[in-house]
Amino acid sequence: MSNLVGLLGIALAFFIVIFFTYKGFHLAYTVIVAVMVVFITNGMPILETFSDIMLKSGIDENGNAFVSGVATQAKTLLPLYLFGAIFGKLFIDSGAATSLSGWLLNVLGKNADANRRRLIGSFCIIFMNAIFNYVGVDPFASLFTMIGIATGVMAEVNIPRRFMPVHLVLGTTIGTALPGSLAVPNILCINFLAEYNTTSYAAAIPGFIFVVFVFGASMWYINKMVRKAAENKEDFEYGPLQPANLTGENLPPVILTIIPLVIIPVGFSTIFSDAPWAAMAVGCIAGIICFGRYIPKKDGVSRIMTIADSMNNGVTIAGIPAIILLNYTLGYAIEAAPAFGTIVELFTNLPGPALLSLAFMGILLLGAAASASGLIIALGVAATVFIPILGVDPNAAHRVLLVSNTVLDSLPFSGAIVALMSIIDVKYKDGYPQIAVTTVLFTFLGVILVAALLILFPGLA
């Protein structure tokens, strides 16, 4: 078939994923339909190609054995999802999250006026969610935890509920973009660029600059909007949410809540640099030791079974992001499509520095795919074209694509945004503009800043 039909098929596949998930169809089977559209419009044998994108092994042109496909990501990501979800449940069920956020609020907000307490409350919510994502707890697994914590903090400092979505989305963005993060996008970058030996700290200085810029600009903007709401006499109201308990006699000491949060990233950076899930598993063990005994017991239930129940609930939650692994099939399918070569040619022939072209490709592909498939496609092109042929530094490519991943992942039709708005019961016109400014506009400017730094000062890679 012609490249035009193939390109139209790729565009239609993106539309199917975006439209039907927005309408409430589950991502798992919607993606499979989109993959079939790519196969058919590109004249690809359906059964054979589907098997190959799930798992393919063989001998490359240099005589080396290789394995590729979605299954190669599953071996890293499935245990990370599992232990991340378990850790998240232990952290919330024990009251560790409430203890840490309450301590931050009380220490930083002591003797502060109303405006400063609101600013500190915003910081606490964003910081807590960033920590969850930084240590590898999947956003889906931490969603309900953070809604509970954010509700309690926002009620305490009187920030209107319509600002809750931007706090949670921004925290996810910051935690994902931080150098050393165990967030899935960072792990994907490591996996796809494995032959170039990039690490989670690739181009760390530009990465930290990105986080400081986005966080600083966003805090300024959020504080400005919250102050304006206060001047208009807007108050917090619970709506469908229940308040989180920020006080209690049986909460774990703050020091015990911090220990596992230190162990996980340190373990990932040292002993378990090739196995992020192992660092998370050790973090779970540390969590059980540090605050497992603080999980409230039910009458007649032993301490061991109380901890086991919390872990069991974590396993159940882990199934949500695990199913989303199927979403990666779209990225592999598009990368294998003959028409994809035309897309690659378009981006590689853009005028200007190749790294900037890679950044724009990452942003647009993620926005079009509305999922991690866009990042997978961009990483594949980076590994096969931009790095070996166009001479882009692997560490620079890693960092630029990771931060590019944060720009269009929070569009209105994003599954996480739709879920947040629904659960919190906030109308788009009330809650989305703040998200658009902070995690779309500011992150876009941050990507340009990172690319410019790495182009002007290549030694930062």
Positions of the model-derived regions?
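Long, contiguous bundles of hydrophobic transmembrane helices that form the permeation core
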Residues: 2-14, 31, 41, 205-309, ...
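Short helix-coil transition sites and intra-membrane helix breaks within transmembrane domains
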Residues: 23-27, 75-77, 88-99, 132-145, ...
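Core transmembrane alpha-helical segments of multi-pass membrane transporters/permeases
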Residues: 54-99, 276-277, 285, 289, ...
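Alpha-helical transmembrane segments of multi-pass membrane proteins
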Residues: 115-131, 157-174, 199-206, 353-366, ...
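Membrane-core helix-loop-helix motifs of multi-pass transport proteins
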Residues: 151-251, 416-454, 459-461
